[in-house]
From Swiss-Prot:
Keywords tagged on the record: ATP-binding, Chaperone, Nucleotide-binding
Protein name: Thermosome subunit
Entries under InterPro entries matching the protein: Chaperone_TCP-1, Chaperonin_TCP-1_CS, Cpn60/GroEL/TCP-1, GroEL-like_apical_dom_sf, GROEL-like_equatorial_sf, TCP-1-like_intermed_sf, TCP-1_chaperonin, thermosome_alpha
Species whose genome carries this gene: Pyrococcus abyssi (strain GE5 / Orsay)
Subunit note: Forms an oligomeric complex of eight-membered rings.
UniProt family annotation: Belongs to the TCP-1 chaperonin family.
Region (Disordered), start-end ranges: 529-550
Length: 550
């Protein structure tokens, strides 16, 4: 609202909130830091878990940064940017979501200190951009190359990703499953590996223990055999995949058939029966003894299939059909008349088994499966969900190493190395930007400091010891949170893909820079319906944040 000769001039609608300059920056920085502080305690092998309860009473227990932020109903626009950091990190690297968010929060904290010293945001932004660029170069220079067939390194990286999650007791076993699964679906082209992790299916079933989790060299489908007269087990299976219904199709036009005598009705029914029998005969003729159908199977067709001893499954999801094709080598056929013996896939065994009281179809023993399934077991729904998240992280980490062939030491070693090298770089740059680069370097120490804090160690004492040891012994020295001492992380098997660290620095610095660029927040008044809905839910119309962050 402006004033002209004492007369107010309304530019924005009534109820619109506006924060300008330092107020806007402070508010945005505070909101982003609250998000970082929320996930900070989950970082590292000794990190704690969060229990999230939604409006329906559903509970999620996890220490996965991306899941925590995804489950939280966040309103503040700057805080939502931090959620995007976690999502991007998860999508691009698969791990390091908490690291990225914590670094972004610390970069903003250090930036605020510079703003309080009257350093212009543009200078801070320029310094941060230079530092982020230099950090990428430093990470490339300290990364260690590994061969794709180095199973020990892949195993250690997968174990590092699983450590600290609910599945930790079985981390070695789960890491082996993750490595094996990725290696099975990996495709080599011109000496480089490409992994599509959509070809690894995670099927969850409560019951049993985490150690009962299994890798199936094929596909597990949460369906059952359609007819009780069909075989429940078929060895040396020849598999047909049909993307159509085994039913008599109805005409798409509004056609009417006028039947005037019982003979005509009988002829009509016989023709229907004949068409269905021809479909089943075609399946038998090409030599298939197992058939997966994406749509329905008529009762009469079921009868004929059972009579011929063919195992059939209906209403199979499209994604499962594609995985079956990749695992067995079968081709998905749209028109059953086009089915040929060459379209059939093969598997050692197709069997219906009871898992946790429910029937499931196991297609296993595929020769060279390019799609596999990990059947996850665990005592409760929450355990099974957290094991799935741990395995997803492990699988993505192994994928990163196979594709890039580069690793880096974990345990805060990379961040300490970056901090030391960026401090040196800041002196070369000089000017006011030097202060911003030094702030960036200082912000990276939040990772080793948080690892120590979460392990119950004295953060300052531990950090001083680790930095001294790091300068003396080299870039692989980090914090061993179990011993509380500096240690060579490569020797201890704490390994991460370089992609995870590079993406974390990239995402965190970009988010911090974007938030620092904002000097004006104009928030429109919420719609009446939304406001009414929030009255009972403790919602707030404005974006003001309050926190005890120092």
């Amino acid at each position: 609202m402006a004033q002209l000769a004492g007369q107010p001039i309304l530019i924005l609608p009534e109820g619109t909130q506006r924060y300008v300059g330092r107020d806007a920056q402070r508010m945005n920085i505070l909101a982003a830091r609250i998000i970082a502080e929320t996930v900070r305690t989950t970082l590292g092998p000794k990190g704690m878990d969060k229990m999230l309860v939604d409006s329906l009473g559903d509970i999620v227990i996890t220490n996965d940064g991306a899941t925590i932020l995804d489950e939280m109903d966040i309103q503040h626009p700057a805080a939502k940017m931090m959620v995007e950091v976690a999502k991007t990190q998860d999508k691009e690297a698969g791990d390091g979501t908490t690291t990225a968010v914590v670094i972004a929060g610390e970069l903003l904290k250090k930036a605020e200190e510079l703003l309080d010293q009257n350093i212009h945001p543009s200078i801070v932004i320029k310094g941060y951009m230079l530092a982020a660029e230099k950090a990428q170069e430093i990470l490339d220079s300290i990364a260690k190359e590994v061969k794709p067939d180095d199973e020990e390194v892949l195993l250690k990286a997968a174990m590092t990703a699983i450590t600290g999650k609910a599945a930790e007791e079985e981390r070695e076993y789960l890491a082996k499953l993750a490595v094996e699964a990725v290696k099975l679906v990996a495709e080599e082209k011109d000496g480089k590996f490409k992994v599509d992790i959509d070809n690894i299916k995670f099927e969850k079933k409560e019951g049993g223990a985490v150690s009962d989790t299994k890798l199936i060299r094929g596909v597990v489908i949460d369906k059952e055999v359609v007819h009780p007269g069909m075989p429940k087990r078929v060895e040396k299976a020849k598999i047909a995949l049909i993307n159509d219904a085994l039913e008599v199709k109805e005409t798409e036009t509004d056609a009417e058939i006028r039947i005037t005598s019982p003979e005509q009705l009988q002829a009509f029914l016989e023709q229907e029966e004949k068409m269905l029998k021809e479909m089943v005969d075609k399946i038998k003729e090409v030599g298939a003894n197992v058939v997966f159908v994406q749509k329905g199977i008529d009762d009469l067709a079921q009868h004929y299939l059972a009579k011929y001893g063919i195992l059939a499954v209906r209403r199979v999801k499209k994604s499962d059909m594609e995985k079956l094709a990749k695992a067995t080598g079968a081709k998905i056929v749209t028109n059953i008349r086009d089915l040929t013996p060459e379209d059939l896939g093969e598997a050692e065994l197709v069997e219906e088994r009871k898992v946790a009281g429910e029937n499931m179809i196991f297609v296993e023993g595929c020769k060279n499966p390019k799609a596999v399934t990990i059947l996850i077991r665990g005592g409760t729904e929450h355990v099974v969900d957290e094991v799935e998240r741990a395995l997803e992280d492990a699988v993505k980490v192994v994928k990163d190493i196979l594709e890039d062939g580069k690793i880096i030491a974990g345990g805060g070693a990379a961040e300490i190395e970056l901090s030391i090298k960026l401090d040196e770089y800041a002196k070369e740059v000089g000017g006011k930007e030097q202060l911003a680069i030094e702030a960036f370097a200082e912000a990276l120490k939040v990772i080793p400091r948080t690892l120590a804090e979460n392990a119950g160690l004295d953060p300052i004492e531990t950090l001083v010891k680790v930095i001294a040891a790091h300068k003396e012994k080299g870039p692989t020295i980090g914090i061993d949170v179990y011993e509380g001492e500096p240690a060579d992380m490569m020797e201890r098997g704490v390994i991460e893909p370089v992609r995870v660290k590079k993406q974390a620095i990239k995402s965190a610095s970009e988010a911090a820079i974007m938030i620092l660029r904002i000097d004006d927040v104009i928030a429109a008044q919420k719609l009446e319906k939304e406001k009414e809905g929030e009255k009972g839910g403790g919602g707030s119309e404005d974006f003001s944040s309050s926190s005890d962050l120092d």
